[in-house]
Amino acid sequence: MKTYDIVIIGGGPAGLAAAVSAKNNGIDDILILERDKELGGILNQCIHNGFGLHTFKEELTGPEYAGRFISQVKELGIEYKLNTMVMDISHEKVVTAMNREDGLFEIQAKAVILAMGCRERPRGALNIPGYRPAGIYSAGTAQRLVNIEGFMPGREVVILGSGDIGLIMARRMTLEGAKVKVVAELMPYSGGLKRNIVQCLDDYGIPLKLSHTVVDIKGKERVEGITLAEVDSKGKPIPGTEEEYSCDTLLLSVGLIPENEISKGMGVDMNPVTSGPKVNESLETNIPGVFACGNVLHVHDLVDFVSEEAKAAGKNAAAYVKADGVETARDNDIVLNPIEGVRYTVPGTINVSNMDEQITVRFRVGGVYKNCYVSAYFDDERVIHRKRPVVAPGEMEEIKLTKEQLLQYPDLKTITVKIEQE
């Protein structure tokens, strides 16, 4: 059985950035396993711009952004296998995978970086009544059809869900000549970035209906129309608010699910809120030497933040391999406690002796809060109290903690992160 220092599962933006980072931190024996026919992951179908402003200080399209990292991977001589499906990873970090060239094979890894990304929530998870006619697509499938395959999914479109992919596809379908009649969102707020609402809906005169959902789909062979209804505070349709829209296509942008079947199979502890692994300050899971980064850990807004997180995971995996897999003592872990409006934090625990000089704690809120404060309490003492005009679930928030700051509290047990009103 062949042994590698680091095996990276997934060749998308997270996997590529983690590989480059591990190589730059002194590890030569790296393998990327990617199930698609090319590296780059979802970026290959994201032909719009808006990528790279943080990482490269310039605006790039998705394929351009991926291309920068793919070039680095090739220049650094990092090995990768395409069209390769990882079937299983054991607790001892034996990776079982298969492809056409090698058949079914096993690899022993000293460290594993999970970078599988996420998948879209399908129609089946929504329980929409009606037949199953042609013309219902997830927004990402429609994006692939239009941008890569060169097929037009339909001419009259309704979009359910205001996640970033749905907003971007509203603009894309309009540019391709379709009529996007409405974007409906179940929640009383949009799930996407503010800039996407402005650039993709407002600029094209596409209406956004908040607190609305699809309650019926018309058509047997092909979608002929849908019925929208307003929902109450519990998400239940309000009788008498129904509106009919004729359309031949319904796109669903109703959330993303981190793809963690392999992680669960190997015994990684999961966070029920993010559907991703629980990680410490090194982005390491409960299994020593298994790290996670990118959308498999929690769903990000910007690929730049995925790359930043993956860079840290690559560096920490390299440090683990160099230390010959010696586990660090975890007795004095500080637990991060998200409450009062904060849904989760990544990481979930911090060991001060193990962390870099600064750590970024990322989190999402559970609703829209205006004129509020993002606060962090070190046990009972409020240390961070930052004014924010508005925070919303569609935009990831972050606070930065320094090692110097944490060392001033030697007995610190809990950091509580919450939203406070004036």
Predicted features and spans:
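FAD-binding core/adjacent interface of flavoenzyme oxidoreductases
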Residues: M1-I9, G67-E156, D232-G240, L251, ...
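Beta1-alpha1 glycine-rich phosphate/pyrophosphate-binding loop at the start
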Residues: Y4-R68, Q72, R144, I148, ...
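A Rossmann-like FAD-binding core segment of flavoenzymes
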Residues: R68-S90, V95-A97, T174-E261, E357-P389
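Predominantly flavin-linked oxidoreductase catalytic cores and closely associated redox partners
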Residues: L104-F105, A111-L208, T213-R222, G289, ...
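FAD-site-proximal beta/loop scaffold in flavoenzymes
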Residues: L114, I136-V146, T249-H300
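Mid-to-C-terminal Rossmann-like scaffold of FAD/NAD(P)H-dependent oxidoreductases
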Residues: D304, A312, N316-R386
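Exposed aromatic-hydrophobic patches
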Residues: R362, G394-L406
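Short, aromatic- and glycine-rich surface loops/edge beta-strands on solvent-exposed regions
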Residues: V374, E404-E422
